[in-house]
From Swiss-Prot:
Subcellular location: Cell membrane
InterPro entries: Glyco_trans_2-like (IPR001173), Nucleotide-diphossugar_trans (IPR029044)
Function: Involved in the synthesis of Nod factor, a sulfated N-acyl-beta-1,4-tetrasaccharide of N-acetylglucosamine which initiates a series of events in the host plant species leading eventually to nodulation.
Record family assignment: Belongs to the NodC/HAS family.
First-tier enzyme category under EC: transferase
Keywords, ordered alphabetically: Cell membrane, Glycosyltransferase, Membrane, Nodulation, Transferase
EC number: 2.4.1.-
Organism listed in the record: Bradyrhizobium sp. (strain ANU 289)
Name used for this protein in its record: N-acetylglucosaminyltransferase
Entry GO CC: plasma membrane
Membrane topology classification: Peripheral membrane protein
Amino acid sequence: MDLLATTSAVAVSSYALLSTVYKTQALYARPASAAPLRDDPGQAEVALPSVDVIVPSFNEDPNTLSECLASIASQDYAGKLQVHVVDDGSANRDLVGPVHKIFANDPRFRIILLAKNVGKRKAQIAAIRSSSGDLVLNVDSDTILAADVVTKL
């Protein structure tokens, strides 16, 4: 019985230690811009993290790109939302130019035009370097998002 009691005590102690470590990590992993968590929901609102959406595109159909960017523009997210659209040296830039102009008028959108095609990953990196959000969301230029996607992050 001594071995069973010792094993049980070690198991319970290990669980308690792991729970404490997990809760400590969760506390320190919160974004620095987030307000402290409150037990009373009426006391204060927790600050929402800022979100940067990265949209790399290359030779995308103008209608498809427009639908994608419109779906991002219509997000119901209450926090700060910035959108970085990266044109990766598209050959059809004259066709997607009007789409870029429409969304460039929205202060949440930033259009980045790369001189030549460098590939999707490097296009994403170009946008990430200029981003400052707490969270980064990568979206393909042929994707249409539901209005609550960023909120559900």
